[in-house]
C-alpha cells in the first residue's frame, strides 16, 4: 500500500513535470540558463556558453526559445565595435524560477520525511 507521503511526492513530481512541459524549459540547458540568470541577474551570452557548455549556435537557439516564451529578454550592446548580447530574466522567468524552487524544495522536504 502506498503511503500518503509517497502519493504527495508523486503528485509533486507530476506538478513539476506539467509546469515544465508547458514551457520551453523542457531542455536542461534552458533550465540552467534560467537558473544562472536568476543568480547572476544579467549575463553575456558568452558567459552562458561557459556555464552550459553549449556552443555559440546552440546557446543562441536556446536563448531564442526562452525569449519567444517570454522567460528572458536580450539586449545587444556595442563594445568597441564588437556587439555583445546580454540576457536577463523577465518577470515571467523569475516567477517560473521561484515556483520551480518552491516545488523542488517541497519535494526534497517531503522525500526526507518519507525516509
Features from the language model and the residues they span:
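Amphipathic alpha-helical dimerization/coiled-coil segments
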Residues: 2-17, 24, 35, 91-115
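Beta-hairpin "wing" of winged helix-turn-helix
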Residues: 69-83, 88
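N-terminal helix-turn-helix DNA-binding core of bacterial DNA-binding proteins
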Residues: 14-58, 79, 86
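Short, hydrophobic-biased segments on the C-terminal half of alpha helices
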Residues: 63-67
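Aromatic side chains
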Residues: 45, 71, 86, 97-100
Amino acid at each position: 500500500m502506498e503511503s500518503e507521503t509517497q502519493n504527495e511526492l508523486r503528485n509533486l513530481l507530476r506538478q513539476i513535470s506539467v509546469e515544465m512541459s508547458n514551457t520551453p524549459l523542457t531542455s536542461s540547458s534552458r533550465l540552467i540558463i534560467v537558473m544562472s540568470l536568476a543568480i547572476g541577474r544579467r549575463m553575456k551570452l558568452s558567459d552562458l556558453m561557459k556555464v552550459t557548455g553549449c556552443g555559440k549556435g546552440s546557446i543562441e537557439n536556446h536563448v531564442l526559445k526562452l525569449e519567444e516564451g517570454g522567460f528572458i529578454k536580450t539586449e545587444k550592446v556595442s563594445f568597441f565595435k564588437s556587439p555583445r548580447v546580454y540576457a536577463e530574466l523577465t518577470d515571467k522567468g523569475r516567477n517560473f524560477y521561484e515556483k520551480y524552487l518552491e516545488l523542488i524544495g517541497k519535494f526534497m522536504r517531503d522525500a526526507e520525511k518519507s525516509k
